[in-house]
Regions:
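A short, internal acetyl-CoA/4′-phosphopantetheine-binding micro-motif in the GNAT/acyltransferase core
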Residues: 29, 52-60, 87-88
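Conserved beta-strand in the GNAT
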Residues: 27, 33-41, 48-53
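Short hydrophobic beta-strand segments in globular cytosolic domains
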Residues: 35, 105-106
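Conserved beta-strand-loop-alpha-helix junction that forms the acyl-donor binding cleft
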Residues: 85-94, 111-116
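Conserved GNAT acetyl-CoA-binding A-motif
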Residues: 75-88
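Terminal substrate-recognition subdomain of acyl/acetyltransferases
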Residues: 86, 100, 104, 117-144
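Conserved acetyl-CoA-binding loop-helix of GNAT-fold acetyltransferases
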Residues: 54, 60-73, 99-100
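Conserved GNAT-fold acetyl-CoA-binding loop/helix
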Residues: 1-16
C-alpha cells in the first residue's frame, strides 16, 4: 500500500485508523505501486467519500474513476441509498468528472444535517463554504 507518510499528509493517523476499522479505505495499485486511495464514511443511509486521491504520476489512467466505482459498489452492497462527496468548485475538471460518474450538485437548501456538520468541520479547518459543493449519486446508479 501507500506509505504511512504519504497517507498522513492527507488524513490524520487517527482518521486513517477509523477509516480502516470501518472498512472504508481502498488503496489503488498500478504495477504493484500505490497509485491512489479513497476513504469513505457511512452516515445512516448514505456513504460519504471523504477523500479520493490519485498520485500525480498515475493521473489520467482511470484510477480515480475505479476508486469512485468501488465506493459506489460498497454503498450498493450495504444497501445504502446514495453516495455523496464535497469538492472544490473552482477546479475546472472536478464537476464534469463527477457528473460523468452520475453525481449531481446538491443545493444548500437540500443539505442534510450531516452535510451541515461536515461543512462546520471544514470551516474549522479554514475551508470556505462557498468554494466547495456537495454532489450526490444514487448508489444503484448504473455507470458506463
Amino acid at each position: 500500500g501507500m506509505t504511512a507518510e504519504q497517507l498522513e499528509d492527507t488524513l490524520s493517523g487517527e482518521e486513517l485508523e477509523r477509516a480502516l476499522s470501518e472498512g472504508g479505505l481502498w488503496i489503488a495499485e498500478w504495477a504493484e505501486q500505490p497509485a491512489g486511495f479513497i476513504a469513505t464514511h457511512r452516515y445512516q443511509e448514505s456513504l460519504y467519500i471523504r477523500e479520493v486521491d490519485v498520485l500525480q504520476d498515475y493521473g489520467r489512467r482511470g484510477i480515480g474513476r475505479a476508486l469512485i466505482r468501488q465506493a459506489m459498489s460498497q454503498a450498493k452492497a450495504l444497501g445504502l441509498s446514495s453516495v455523496f462527496l464535497r469538492t472544490f468548485r473552482e477546479v475546472e475538471w472536478n464537476t464534469p468528472f463527477y457528473e460523468k460518474l452520475g453525481f449531481t450538485p446538491i443545493a444548500e437548501s437540500e443539505w442534510t444535517a450531516v452535510m451541515e456538520q461536515i461543512v462546520e468541520v471544514e470551516e474549522e479547518w479554514g475551508l470556505v463554504r462557498d468554494r466547495r459543493q456537495f454532489m450526490a449519486a444514487g448508489a444503484h446508479h448504473q455507470m458506463v
